Amino acid sequence: MGVTLFKEVSYTLSKLIDSIEMGEIGLPEIQRPFVWPNTKVRDLFDSMYRGFPVGYLLFWANGSGGGHRQIGTGTKQRVPQLLIVDGQQRLTSLFAVFKGIPVVREDFRAERIRIAFCPLTGRFEVTDAAILRDPEFIPDISEIWSEQSNIFELADAYIERLRRARPVTPQEQKAIQKAINSLDNLSSYPFTALEIASSATEEEVADV
């Protein structure tokens, strides 16, 4: 066996989000635009909420300082140290929903992905007109992780909205608060990344 060209690194989701926001993680030019349908984004959050694994990430240490794109449309603060080789769709989905920002589709159209959550059933849905009218759902989970949000106030506001539609039992109130707290805790969801050394060539990385 030759020299090992990768190492295994553990991340929390919040660390990944912060690294993308700071520009430490970017997209190499060989990657695709965002192509996932919103239902796949919904399913990703559902799997994470239920505690299932959602796959490894594959990063490539950026030795050149060029040939990359970054997630989102804002100006990043630094040259990416890591380029995403596998996991672009998952990380773009998570970053867009956590930060409440639009993704750029293949036709260069900006789209905000809105995912709804029902605390009493643990169900996720793509937000539509019917979901917006349904008091059982939080219509946009992005607000959970907004810097302006308070998780306790958000839970209270949801319960109050539900009470205007029907009675809420004390047991339901506890279940709602627990579910919203569990959703908030997705920021600590664990990911494992394999980081390929910068000495690997683009051809070698493409063959992985």
Regions found by a protein language model. Name each.
Residues 2-208:
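Basic- and aromatic-enriched surface patches that contact anionic nucleotides/nucleic acids
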